[in-house]
Amino acid sequence: KFMGEEELSKLQKIKLISDYISQTQSEIIKHNSNIDIVSDIKVNGRNLTNIGLFRKYTENYLLSNKLINNEMTVMCRQLTPTSQGVPLEIYAFITDKEWKNYENIVSDLFDHLLASLSTFDLELFELPSKININ
C-alpha cells in the first residue's frame, strides 16, 4: 500500500530506515513535481510503499547485526506474487559457522522480522488448517 504522511512520520522514528525515508521522500517530491499529476491520487506519481519500506528495513536490520557477514551478499528481494501473497527472499551469511549457533541466529533474526510486520501494516500468510476453520 502507498504510505501517507502520517504513516511515514511514524515509520521515520525507526532508526534503521529514517535516513532512507527522508532521502527517498525528497527524491520522490522532486520527481513528482516535474510531472503534471494530481498529487492527492497516489497512483499518479512515485510514492513509498509499506512492502518497499519493510524490504529496506530488513536489509538494514541484517546489515546492522554483527553476526551477519557484511562482506558477502546481504539482500532482501521481492519474488513473483502468488495466490498466497508476495514472497520476500533474504540472502545473508552468518559469521558463525557452527550449525546449532547458525540455526539460533537465523531463528532470532526471523523472530524479529516476523514481529515487525505489523509495524509496516503487513501480515504473514498462513494456509488455513482444520484448526483455523473450526
Residue positions per predicted region:
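Structured, soluble regulatory/oligomerization domains located on the cytosolic or IMS-facing side
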Residues: K1-N134
